[in-house]
Amino acid sequence: MKTLFFLSVFIFLLLHLSPGKMEILLGSNGGARCDINKKSFDCYHRNGRCRFNCRKREYNNGDCSQYQSCCLPTRNL
């Protein structure tokens, strides 16, 4: 019963906390986080690596300055 309770709390937190807050909660360095355009993507550091979260797809090429390669805003056609 306790396992079910903790699992439900964990799932609730996953669904309701932003990635940065979740990283701090789980203890992964709480590294620097640089939101360039919150509506379309986030660029942040996790475990010494740079990651891009672009429309719910994560890219990891190690260079936050290259965010354009995966995170260009798209127009609605």
Curated annotation (Swiss-Prot):
Subcellular locations according to the entry: Secreted
Bridged cysteine pairs (disulfide): 43-70, 50-64, 54-71
Cleaved signal peptide residues: 1-20
UniProt record, GO biological process: defense response to bacterium; innate immune response
Top-level lineage group: Eukaryota
GO cellular component terms attached to this protein's record: extracellular region
Classification via Pfam families: Defensin_beta_2
UniProt keyword Mitochondrion, yes or no: no
Major location (coarse): secreted
Keyword Magnesium: no
Keywords for the protein's UniProt record, in alphabetical order: Antibiotic, Antimicrobial, Defensin, Disulfide bond, Secreted, Signal
Tissues with expression: Lowly expressed in spleen, kidney and lung.
Its biological purpose: Has antimicrobial activity.
Stated family: Belongs to the beta-defensin family.
Name of the protein in its database record: Defensin-B6
